[in-house]
Structures are given as C-alpha cells and as structure tokens.
C-alpha cells in the first residue's frame, strides 16, 4: 500500500512528529525503536557515535515501517510520521518544522549541557518556526542513571569524554525545566525498551488535542485525553555476582620433581650398588606404590630393638634436634649476633641425640632388618643418623639397601614417576626401567613402559589417571590416620599430624617455614595460635587433594582467614563459593540471612575475600529496606566506604522513591480534577431539563 493512501483514508489522522535535540542524545535510536522496533545491546549503544538522520522516505520504501506507523490512541486511528533532524545548532531546520503537528524535544540525562540547550536554543527555535505546535520534553538514555559508569566508560571509545557520577541528572531536573516551559515530561531508555510508547502516544494526544481546537467538527476527536502521567521506571535488580574460581594450581608435580632433586626433609636413603646414595621421602613413595607402603609400614610396626616404633623415634629425634638448634634463652639476652655452635658442641649434641634415641653410635654396626626373603629387589633396611644434603642437619633416616641388579639410572626414573605420576616417552633405558618395575611389583609402570615400546603411548592416559586416583585416596588415608607423619600442628583445640614434603610442594607459606632457617624446620611439633582443628583439617585436605571438603561444623569465615594467612587464593575462592552456597540455601529455605551477611561483610573485606564481600554488598543493597529496618545500628556501624556504597547502589534507588511519591501525588491531584470536571459537565447537561415553576 502506498504511503499517500493514509492521507486519503477517512477518520485516520496523520501526525507529523519532528524529533529535535543535541547531537548524541539518542534521537535517531529513539525513532528507530518506535518505527522499526529496533532493540540494541549495551555494547551497540556505547559504540562510537556517528551523526545520522533517519530518512523519512522509509515510510514509502519499507512496508513494515508503514504498518508500524499506524496506531489507535483513545479510539482514534492515527498514522505517525517521524521526522529526524541533525543536532547541530547551526543547521537550518525550517523545512522539518513546516506543517509539524508535534515536536519531541530530546536531551540526555547524562549530559547536563543538552538540558541547558533546551531552554537556551531549542525551545526558542521551535517557537520561532512553529509557535502553535505542542512540544513534548523527553529525557533519553535513562539506563545510564543506574548503570555501572566505570564499565560504561571502559566500553566507550578511547577518546570519548568519560561520564561522571555528577553528570547524571535526577528526574526532578528535567521536570523543573518542563514545568518552567509548560511542557509534558517523559523519560525513555532504548536499552530497557522503557518509555518509548509513552512518549509517542502522548505526543499523538498532544497533536490531536491541538487539532481538535481547529477542527472542532470532528466528533471522533472528542475522546482524546490530555497527555497522561508516566509511571516512574523501576530499574531491575542487579544480578548477584558470580563467584569465579581461578585456575586450580597444579598438584605440585613440578615441585615434587624438584623436591626429589633437592631432598629437603628427606627421611629415606637408598643405597644402590654400595656406592650410589639417593635420598627420598616416605610419604611420596608409600602413597604411590603399595610395595613401598608395605615396606615403610612394616618399619613403623617393628623396631630393631623391639621397644618402640621407628616412627615415634623419629618424632623424638626431631624434637631433640630442634632443641639443639634453637638459641639458648640466656644467650638471646646477650648483645651481638647469636653464637654458632662449634664443632665439638655439634659432636656432643649428636652423641646425646644418638644415645637418647637408642640408635647405634658412630662406628657401630646398626641392626639391619633383612628383606631378601620379603622381596628380591631389597637387601635390608635399618635406621641410622644421616646428614641431610640440603639443610646439612643430622636426623634419623630409613636406610634401604637395594639389590645389585637395581641400576641407579632406571631407579631414579622410577622414583620420578612415583613422585610426579609422569613418564617421559623419550626415556632411553626403557628395558632397564621395565625390569626394575617388574622386580618392585609396580605393574602400572611396567604396563606404561610396554605401551611406549609398542607405540601405544596413548593408552597410558587411563593408567595415569587411575594412578593419581589411587595416590589421592592413599594420601587422604595417611592424613586421617597420621601414617608416616613427620610434623604435628598444635592448635587451640587439639593437634593434627601432617607431612612436611607434601606441605612444602603444595604451599609456599609452608615451604618457607619448613625449608628455611626457621626453628620449625627442625621441629616435629609446630604451634599455630588462633586456629581451630576443623579449619586446619580443611586446609590440609585442600593442600593434599586440591579440593575443598566442607564439614557441617566448618565456619567459612575462619577457613577464609586461614587460607588468606597461608597465601592460598584458590582456597579462598573455594571457601567464598561455599559460603555463598550455604547462604543461598538458607535464604531459599526461608531462613533470614541478613544479620549473617552483615557480619560477613567487613570480615570478608579484611581477609581479602573480595568476591564474598561483593556478594554481601549486593545482598544488602538489593534488600536494603528490609535489612535497614531490622539492623539499623549495624548498618550505621559500617565503614564510611561501605555506607557510601549502600546509598549509591541501594534498591530501589532514592531517586525512584522520590519519583514514585511525586507520581502518586500528581495522580491523586489529577483524579480530583477529573472528578470535579465530570460533576461540572453533569450539571451543565441536566440544567436544560429543569422545569420552571412559573411555566408550571
């Protein structure tokens, strides 16, 4: 259908609506939203502004635009023709103003200058070219009033003027200008699709009322109302922040390989071919191989002299050694640097240590436990005082003498596999490695070597996965039972046994404590104040398995504080996620969480749990009225920064509450005016039917 036919259709009012305003206030996008039903994402709205004008010939070219121009307002059929204009002040717009029925004057609520130009430039121009045409004042880009301006400014073009919080105009500013000029006032947001119909429907009403004054004989215009009030826009609740878990750190594979090369805290010494010495750690070997697990467990259950287990002796030796290495309290009070023990003192100390533990003195032959009948790969095992090659400290070690058939090179490769769970496909001596794996009954390694030799290395992935699962389960078992432990943490409400090698490879804080020159590195008991057993158990579970195993009695804030103290950001994030899940579950079941969230807020901020703090801020702000009514004192006791955040991000916002009050007040006033007007019309209608007494 041709656009000109709308002018010929009976009882169809064609309305020419001219849209004017400064550049970049959103005129063209407002027109496209009405004429083309265009929806835009925030990214498109924030793209670089290019001055454009929506062509009026779209009504002739595009059938869809023509169909959308037709509407019914107050039982009057209309065809709305929108005219876009340039925002440059020096442009000549007299042709656009010609024969206009209504003018929509736009400004941006994020640009105070555009509102100033309404009074200084645009309104005088409109009254100059079309003095009798009704005008509608429209505040565009309403969504910027509640948007995250920092994110908005980051998304805009680099050289764009940043939008400041002080640039955002409250609704009363636009309403004051509209009242001063005697204009109806509306606000719109193309992003939220709010106010578009309000603006153009009421622009049509204003045009039809003006036309009714001139064409009073048109009866279908009698029902047209004056421009209606616009209900205020309630911004949507911001979605709760999602707790993001950073990439999980590796299971200490590289650190374990490094620990094998630099055997700090080593407690096992392998002697190969009577000359090659290789230091290792029981916990890594026992959790990776059932053969070594049985070997070291047998050592703990049986001692050479039949009195007490070797595992208990090792703890005593480390305590005694720690007392030797610690500085004497009397010497600490003396000025000057601490004295280093002389050679004769070391000799005396080591002798005392040996005697205290019942171990063989230097030069004596230690009692060896024969292993040839137990396994053909081993000769014997005994306890002996040895000097650690890294820390240069003497301590008890399990000395294992291997069979002559065990070659040093393949045996080192086997140990590296037990530490890391990885096998290099380019290993040179695969045959020797396979032989040692067969002798030591490590069948998974034997199978992996066979796959590599058969060019089927891809099959090793499943074997490696099963290896790590078995190792993780064995580590959990050793942690829960304290098997092969070499350190005990003394806590406020108990003690927990742990393993220094695993801690060194899993936590830099622990590595610094046990691997440095601190006195804890030589002690088997470490006192950690202000820590409870449940939280420490959760931390150790995480360090051993890289997973959080929450307990019903676990306090998330205590765990976060401990994880932050140990410099474990991944565990902090897991604890934050657990805390949010527990709070959400409680809220879903109808339990009030407002007080708990308030108590979490500043503790989370203090312990660097920024994601949990952001979630708490969001909950408080989106439920501000209910939280404030129940916990007013707690709200007021928060820091100034938090209170400022509450005021800025509370929902519903203050400006909405003010607008809602104004809307309800004006609505009541209009209803009273309409009632009074209807009474007046009713009296005028019936006054002609009253009979006069004189006539009667």
Swiss-Prot record:
Disulfide bonds: none annotated. GTP binds at residues 21-28, 84-88, 140-143. One of its GO terms (biological process) is regulation of cell shape. Ubiquitous, with highest levels in skeletal muscle, placenta, testis, stomach, and kidney, followed by uterus and adrenal gland. Expressed in a variety of fetal tissues. One of its GO terms (molecular function) is protein kinase binding. Keywords: GTP-binding, Nucleotide-binding, Repeat. GO terms for cellular component: cell projection; cytoplasmic vesicle; cytoskeleton; endosome membrane; plasma membrane. PROSITE patterns: BTB (PS50097), RHO (PS51420). Residues 327-348 are annotated as: Disordered. Residues 1-210 are annotated as: Rho-like. Residues 266-427, 485-552 form the BTB domain. Gene3D superfamilies: P-loop containing nucleotide triphosphate hydrolases, Potassium Channel Kv1.1, Chain A. InterPro entries: BTB/POZ_dom, P-loop_NTPase, SKP1/BTB/POZ_sf, Small_GTPase, Small_GTPase_Rho. It comes from the Eukaryota. The keyword Nucleotide-binding applies. Belongs to the small GTPase superfamily. Rho family. This is Rho-related BTB domain-containing protein 1. It comes from Homo sapiens.
